[in-house]
Regions:
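Fibrous stalk/shaft segments of extracellular and virion attachment machinery
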Residues: 1-33
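Extracellular beta-sheet repeat scaffolds used for adhesion and glycan interaction
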Residues: 86-93
Length: 117
């Protein structure tokens, strides 16, 4: 079975086209990336980290307000969330995700940095 998700913004004109379907919804929980080694996230990345050893996921450099990154630790190893110069929850330190933990991080401003929802 194949399911295609389309956002309302793509259908604002009321028409469904193959180009709109190919563009995807661009919304939450779409196009997850599976990572087993260190990776620098891009804005809107939705990552599942699956590793038995420690892995570092580095947040995007020079983020803008509203940028979002989702990270899920599906492995046994600890995931370090590298702040890449931005604060995380107003703190100038990296974060960690234990096994089976997840975080949705939204960039607010240079003081708060990425805020965990």
């Amino acid at each position: 079975m194949s399911v295609t998700q389309v956002s309302n913004s793509l259908l604002a004109d009321g028409s469904v086209t193959s180009a709109k379907l190919a563009a995807g919804a661009g919304g939450a929980f779409n196009n997850f990336l599976i990572k087993t080694t260190a990776y620098t996230a891009a804005t809107r990345d939705q990552l599942i980290v699956n590793s038995s050893s420690a892995v570092t996921i580095t947040l995007p450099a020079s983020p803008s307000a509203g940028n979002v990154v989702f990270i899920k630790n599906a492995g046994a190893g600890v995931v370090t969330v590298g702040r890449n110069g931005s604060n995380i929850n107003s703190q100038a330190q990296d974060g960690t995700l234990a096994a089976d933990a997840s975080a949705t991080l939204v960039f607010v401003d240079s003081t708060i940095g990425f805020k965990e929802l």
